[in-house]
Amino acid sequence: EGEFLDGVSHEDISVRVMKLLCDEIGGDVMKMAVDIFENKYHKRFLHSLISSQLDMDRLDYLNRDSFYTGASEGIVSHERIIAMMTVSPDGEIVFEEKGLYSVEKFVVARRMMYWQVYLHKTALGADFIANGIIRRAIELIKEGKELPAPPSLKFLLSRKAQACDINDEYLEHYMSIDESDMWSVFKQWIHTDDFILSYLCRALCHRRLFFAKLLPE
């Protein structure tokens, strides 16, 4: 994502997509959803539920990623945490005292998942190679080389968008690309005549990832 967008965060894209849906669908509900996301809604605690150190997204991905990776350290009692939530008189999310240990376990679980899964050397190595593939593809397209890719991916590779470039056309192309598209082109690019691109794609698809080396501080 960062290779396609320059200085544009995932949240920026989310807001633009929501506003696009708001224009298409209309209605007060969609407008309220955008206001909550941008923290403009008068009930401020609703924004905390979707964007904070203990929001619904984090509660979801810890359990989900624990299940799919087999790392049991990320399992948290989300039902218990939600049950202990309440709203203070000044409109902030707070927790009952008896829910303290559940919140503490969530914090520890999140830290453990970062060390064991999200910052694992294999995950970082694969991410490094994937970003290198996109950067190399962008360089080759700038040089005029033709690479096999879906039209929407070619559109994204041919320009690195700034915030001012994110219009409806860009969003349409951006949202039409999914993981299967990326894996498909990575496998096709193995056979390209550019050595760097071919090498990186082969390394990722055949799981020949770079080795990690610890350096002294």
Describe every region a protein language model picked out:
Residues G2-E217:
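Histidine-centered, transition-metal-coordinating active-site segments
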